[in-house]
Amino acid sequence: GGCLRGEEVRVGRVGPSGAGKWAVMRLIATITTPTAGTFRWNGTDIVGRPVAMRRTLGYLPQDFGVYPELTAEEFLHYMAALKGVPGGAARPRIDTLLETARLEEARGRRLGGFSGGMIQRVGIACALLNDPDLLVADEPTVGLDPEERARFRALLTDLAEERVVLLSTHIVSDVEATASRLAIMHDGRLAATAAPEALIDRVRDRVWEWVVGHDELGRVRDAYRVTKATRGPGGVRVHAVAKQPPSAEATPAEPTLEDAYLSLLSGPTSPR
């Protein structure tokens, strides 16, 4: 079990594929019902009252489909009608959301010509039509190029100023750039929940860098939790997590969130 307090407005749920993130997101979105236990939002048991949750929820699924023949503005009006947003309120709300999602210049373009990043921003606009208190985004940056991913991260950070944003991803850099608190899942269970800085502190003084020969890299990967390897003319500079210096030439390195994440997933191993 766990609890998200009011000040924790940007929560990243991260874990490898198959960790259980998708199942949890579907429970939160009231798409599926838990077989046991309770799930509360602001004190209300949403298992027994899913409609109450849906009124305050905005959900962006991993596979967000659109009608390619519609323009962005037409599609948002269509979705607003499905969500029961009154006609008089829909137009100004859509105008605001097109600006928020940085789509105002593309409002009259057909969705069939949009890039993947633009489609995801249309998805965010749809999720915000009912002005939700909780925005849930499931793997929203998968398939986006680096520029679109950075733009989408910035959008999520801006949106978290007024609501709780729950981001599920297996891409550590996504949560590193957007989340004020992380919930790490592994094998269907919550392995840790903490601020990114606290997770990084767990591996401080256990991160090392040293240079190995090109033919030694495989052995080093087998022996240590290597999070980065940079090839050069003089060998491979290895960045790894280990309790003790892996080599006489190893020097302490600044830990990263990826170091903390991968170390946590690997569990207590030796010599890692």
Region roles according to the model:
Residues F152-H239:
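ABC transporter nucleotide-binding domain
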Residues H77, A81, G88-A106:
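Conserved ABC ATPase "signature" region
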Residues I124:
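Hydrophobic anchor residue at the start of the ABC signature
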Residues L135-D138, L144:
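Catalytic Walker B motif of ABC-type/P-loop ATPase nucleotide-binding domains
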Residues G37-D45, M53:
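Conserved ABC transporter NBD signature motif
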Residues A29:
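Helix-to-loop junction immediately C-terminal to a conserved catalytic motif
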